[in-house]
Structure formats: C-alpha cells, structure tokens
A protein has these predicted regions:
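A general secondary-structure boundary signal
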Residues: 57, 87, 100-104, 181-184, ...
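Short, surface-exposed, polar/charged, turn-prone segments marking secondary-structure boundaries
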Residues: 25-27, 83, 182-184, 226-230
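Face-selective signature of the C-terminal outer-membrane beta-barrel domain
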Residues: 1-7, 29-168, 191-192, 196-199
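Surface-exposed extracellular loop regions of Gram-negative outer-membrane beta-barrel proteins
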Residues: 64, 117, 161-168, 177, ...
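Short helix-capping and inter-helix turn/linker motifs at the boundaries of alpha-helical repeat units
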Residues: 84, 131-132, 177-179, 233
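Exposed loop/turn and edge beta-strand positions of beta-sandwich/beta-sheet ligand-binding modules
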Residues: 39, 90, 138, 181-183, ...
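Feature captures outer-membrane beta-barrel proteins of Gram-negative bacteria and organelles
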Residues: 142, 183-189, 243-245
Length: 245
C-alpha cells in the first residue's frame, strides 16, 4: 500500500525539587510518515506422489517508509529528524509426509532471508545512524506422530543455522553479527480414557529480537526522554515443560 500519515502531540514537563518548580517545558511534536509501495507475492504447491504428500510454500515481501519529525520546546525549534527504512523478506518451506508404522512421518526444509536498512539523520540532538541488517536462516526438520490405544505420541527434531550480518555505515560489526547452530527438539505425549486425560510436553523455543529493537536510531520524545534500540540484543532461548490433566 501507499499513503501518508500525520501524528501530532503536545504536552508539558514540569520539574520540581523540594516541592518547588525548577523547570517547565511546553512541547509540541509533529511527525509525517510517508509509506512507499509495499509488495507481496506468494507461490504454493500441494500434491501427492504415491503415498507421499508434498506441500511447498514461498513468500516475498518488500516494504519501505520515510518519516520526518519536528519538535518544539517553549516555541523554539529544537529537534528535526529524518528516518528512512527499506526491508525485504524471502521465505520458503517444503514439507513431505507419508504414513509410517501406523503413524505419520514428515520431514522438510525451511529457509528465510531478510534484509533491512535504516538511515537516520538529525540536526544535532543525538548521532546519525546508518544500520543495515542481513539475516539468513536454514533449517531441516523431521516429525513423527502415532496413536497407541489411549495414547497420542509426537516427537520431532529441527536443526537450524542462523547467520546475522550487522553493518554500521557500511562496515560489518563482528560483535553484533552472531551465528547460531541449534538443535530444537519437540516431545509430547497425551493419554485419554473414560473422560480422564493428561498430557506432558517439552519444547525449546527461540525468540529473535524485532529489527526495530536493534537499530541505533534515536527517537525523540521530549527534552528528557529518548528511545533507542540495542544492537547487542541476543536471541532468547526458552526451555518449556508443560503438564496438564
């Protein structure tokens, strides 16, 4: 999609010491957001080859935006900032499945490639930023599920290679460009009989920080308040055990 949006805010900040007012700031912020053309494309295939089911899906996304920010404190123009962002994503997933030993076996691959470039310039209240993040994820996985009388069993494993390349003003920053090689297991069992049931499961989850949290761009909120990402944030891994009845 394409379009523009305007955001305007105003307020005041009062500073007190020992119950006496020491500073008062009336502020007004105006922000114009310009979105360029967003592109999205999808391709998929679902079919059979003998006993094998084949499911393939691929996506492409492209987005860019541009915003101008102007802020005034006590009628003095103090902040001018310009932010530009371009991002793209390619993703593909292939899953092949078939009956096996009275259960179902599946395996496949998944690939994701992302590319985001943020450019931030300002009039002196902070530092300019030029951040470029590229990330590639390659994964292979297998899964098997089966029902045995009152039991339902599921087990799976996934190998994932994740490479991130972080650039500041065109220079790769090794300390902020991690590589992960992870084996991610999934185990689950449930039992049900005569209205009674219980379940057990274990899963390893990975959560990557959003790109907006990794940028060095500084967002002005008031004379005393700024917001900024942290490019040193790492992927979070959580071991999750659950039981229910």
């Amino acid at each position: 999609g394409i379009g523009n949006a305007d955001r305007n805010s105003s307020g005041k900040t009062v500073t007190r010491r020992n119950d006496e007012e020491t500073d008062r700031i009336n502020f007004t912020t105006a922000e114009q957001i310009h979105t360029g053309w967003d592109h999205a494309a999808n391709a998929y295939y679902a079919g059979e080859l003998g006993k094998w089911n084949i499911d393939f899906n691929a996506d492409y996304l492209f987005k860019r935006s541009h915003s101008d920010q102007n802020a005034m404190n006590n009628d003095d123009a103090t902040v001018q900032a310009d932010s530009r962002m371009r991002s793209s994503l390619y993703a593909a997933k292939l899953v092949v499945s078939a009956p096996l030993w009275n259960g179902r076996f599946s395996f496949g691959t998944e690939e994701t490639f992302t590319n985001r470039h943020d450019i931030f310039t300002q009039n002196g209240f902070s530092a300019d930023a030029d951040d470029h993040i590229k990330q590639s994820v390659y994964a292979a996985f297998a899964d098997y599920s089966r029902s045995i009388r009152h039991w339902k069993l599921n087990m799976g494993i996934r190998y994932e290679h994740q490479q991130t390349d972080y650039y500041e003003k065109g220079i790769r920053i090794d300390a902020q460009s991690p590589t992960y090689n992870d084996i991610i297991p999934v185990l689950a069992a449930s039992w049900s009989h005569n209205g009674k049931s219980f379940s057990l499961s274990y899963r390893l989850r990975k959560n990557n920080p959003d790109y907006s949290l990794l940028t060095n761009s500084i967002r002005y909120r008031s004379k005393y308040e700024y917001s900024q990402g942290n490019p040193l944030l790492k992927t979070q891994k959580t071991h999750r055990f659950s039981a229910g009845a």
